[in-house]
């Protein structure tokens, strides 16, 4: 909750330092390794938001860690014990999370490849296909929206107006389709995901509806899209988004 609202505080650094304190307490007092791992990641995120990248590397290390297939081992063990439903759920959740990690990681790398248009375009195409095939706009709309915005930003940096506009069209269309209150849940394919989300994660969005709507609109009006300021289609997109979010113009 602190991480989701720290930017709204008059003293954001104080809030982030509080996050660090809470994470340290979990690491010192908990015997649950999963909680400890989550605390380490959240503490590192708080440091990154404070502009402390060197400290983040000290906490997490500087290299990619090898994934040893823990989830597959646990699922196989459950199956050997006759716990078929548990095994299926673990594999579904693992597949869902790895699919999202692929999209999020690819999205994060986009702006690092702006000077390499061939690689940039290929990444965009591959992630677009993943989003479509895995129904990501319904499963985890934030992952899809973040990708569309990052892709649009990269295209704008390359001064490619048509491609920038296309990504913003996808962004706007997805925003308009959002059903509030925003929740996380599975679908017909990930049919065991919803129960896991209810057990392990709060399915409700961590921020209130009006804050989400305000940010959805503000994100479509970033300075990065200055090259479209006089474009009629872009102006129409923004007006349409304002209408569907039932918001007045954000100053």
Show the residue positions of the predicted features:
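Residue-level signature for tetratricopeptide repeat
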Residues: 4-9, 42, 46-47, 77-78, ...
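Alpha-helical protein-protein interaction modules
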Residues: 102-231, 235-236, 240-251
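Amphipathic alpha-helical repeat scaffolds
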Residues: 24, 41-45, 61, 72-76, ...
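Short coil/linker segments at helix-helix boundaries
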Residues: 2-26, 205-209, 213, 219
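A short, hydrophobic/aromatic-rich structural module that often spans a beta strand
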Residues: 37-69, 163, 231, 238-251
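Short, charge-rich amphipathic alpha-helical segments embedded
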Residues: 3, 7-11, 32-33, 47, ...
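Generic helix N-cap/helix-start motif at coil->alpha-helix transitions
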Residues: 30-40, 63-73, 97-109, 140-148, ...
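Alpha-helical repeat scaffolds
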Residues: 12-28, 51-64, 84-97, 118-135, ...
